[in-house]
Amino acid sequence: MDELKEVRDCCSGSWMVWGDFNLIYRAEDKSNNRLNRRMMSRFRQFINATDLQELYLKGRLFTWSNERDTPTLERLDRVFTSEDWALAFPNHELSALATECSDHAPLLLKTDCTITHCMRFRFENFWPKCEGYLQVVEEAWNAPLPWSTSDADAFRCLDFKLRNTAKMLKSWSAKRVGSVRLQLAIAKEITLRLDAAQDTRTLMPHELALRRKAKLCSLGLASLQRTLVRQRSRITFLAEGDANTRFFHLQACHRSRKGHISKLRTEETVLFREDEMADAVFQHFENMLGTRGIQNNYINFEELDLPSVGDTMFDHCFSEEEIWQAIGEMPNDKAPGPDGFTGLFFKIAWPIIKHDIMRAFQAIWALDGRSFYLVNQAYMVLLRKKNDASSIGDYRPISLIHSFAKLLTKVLARRLTSHVKKLVKQSQSAFIRTQLIHENYKAVQLSAKLLHRQKIPSALIKVDIAKAFDTVNWRFLLNLLQHLGFSRRWLDWILSSASTKVILNGSPGRRICHARGLRQEDPLSPLLFVLVMEGPNALLNLAYGRGLLRTLHPMI
């Protein structure tokens, strides 16, 4: 390692170090706890001193085995590169092959594994900085409809306007803006060559003008590039800046590689073909979301002493002010849904699109849901829960909801948030503002200490509801909301037809029409889930009131 340090100090440019290091630097790189902490620390110091980063190994945790009946497994074979190398080969892929004639797994590095998928429209946050942006949006949004006005409902018109605006923006960006990265490289090269020429001679007037123009272009294009790579990285806790641009770019490349699924394990076999994996994913989520849940036990809500919303005006007409406030809370950098638009589009173009958005909200209030399904769609992406993810259960489904549907649920969530505390007991603290979930942890700690002091044989039971959001029974939810005093209009809003397509390696699959469950990343879903959990909570309180359960202590 000392020799590698000396060589690294003398050399510049892209670096790669590949081989059997016979060392580990993390405890999880070994299958048991027999660790040499001193050597692990030295290895970490070497990695930090040489400014190298390890390439992600796809599908494997360990690369060496001692081949015993109870084997010791370790990650001894690694590939380290410099940041320059990772930027030069953003589509690389490192995998391990079978250990045929050795106790080490051979490593296979592919430097150009371009992930092909259909190109969807995505709103770029740097577009509003470009000249002519609002003019393009206004022309596209106010383009004549391809059908008569009498036949067009609000949602059909809104869907057409969003699609037409997306099409026009994509065309405008290709013609007027072009490739920001390529233009920036050209501007820098022109500046560099003119700087070199200026070292040996006086520049001509037209060369000086070109140099000034190239430098101005470099500044503007660098700003656009920072916005672009920050949006791709999905990192919101760091601001745009020259120091962070490279980090954003590396993170975006890492997200792209980590999100790719090359194989999928089912109960019967392991799938490798894209169409077979897509069918397996569709069947899994069709059974989970597209099948109505069976409610075997019915609850008499009259016995539970549940509160009522009363005259809270949950379903009054939507105002322009509350919709604008909801738009102000929409994030600018979150991954977009099927329409491709982010919250920034609504904020910048609000004077242009306001009339059609308000018309759509008025149709929702009037329960005119014709064609609402066009703007109530979502994409579902699968995020790894662990590095060696293999089956569908090893991925976390996240919904990317259509921007208008998300705006609607944001408005409804804002209305419900101020009243949800009155509808649930204090023992519920998740997803409720001004209440801390840590208080429940503290109550469990106090209970355990009290049981320990009492010396009474007892058991603390932790219940984990698998796929909690995805398996909520709609009939139970609607019966509960009706008993809580929610109007029929609110129930119709919640029951609005929704559909989802699962994204596998960048390509959307078949449509799944929802029949149960709550959508992840929907602003309204956490609040509805809290109300659902108030049912079991009220059952426990009823059992306590009838003497079937007792408290450990009056304060717990």
Descriptions of predicted regions:
Residues 465-556:
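Conserved polymerase palm-domain catalytic core
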Residues 11-15, 415-428, 453, 532-556:
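Active-site palm subdomain of RNA-directed nucleic acid polymerases
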Residues 14-18, 22-30, 107-272, 316:
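Arg/Lys-enriched, amphipathic patches
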Residues 4, 17-20, 43, 47, ...:
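Mobile genetic element proteins and their domesticated derivatives, centered on retroelements
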Residues 136, 197, 203, 233-393, ...:
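Surface-exposed loop/turn segments and immediately adjacent short secondary-structure elements
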Residues 16-18, 333-341, 374, 380, ...:
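Conserved catalytic palm subdomain of right-hand nucleotidyl-transferase polymerases, strongest
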Residues 1-8, 46, 188, 193-194, ...:
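Inter-domain linker/hinge segments that demarcate the starts of reverse transcriptase
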